[in-house]
Amino acid sequence: MNTAKFRYIICKSFGHNTLDIKYNEGNRIITHFNMCIIDTDNNTFITLYNPNAGEITVKVEDIIELVPHKA
């Protein structure tokens, strides 16, 4: 996992772009699409939101994939 790359994407996307995210949650891999970053804690944790998934908080080191959403 490339946390430096993810932190860069988070910094560039905060308040501007929607993202697709795939991350580890225990023994499961979770995927959400078209998420907006609404908060970050010095890029250690990020909070994302979309109307379908609601609000989620993810530890940056648990992120597997973080890419700009493509319509």
Regions found by a protein language model. Give the residues of each.
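SH3/SH3-like beta-barrel fold
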Residues: F45-N50
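Structured surface patches comprising rigid loops and adjacent beta-strands/short helices at the edges
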Residues: C36-I38, V58-H69
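Generic short amphipathic/hydrophobic targeting helices enriched at N-termini
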Residues: K5-F6, I56-V60
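Short acidic/polar mixed-charge low-complexity motifs
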Residues: N27-R28, N52-G54
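Short glycine-rich, low-complexity segments
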Residues: M1-N27, V67-A71
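Structural detector for short beta-strands of small beta-barrel domains
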Residues: I29-C36
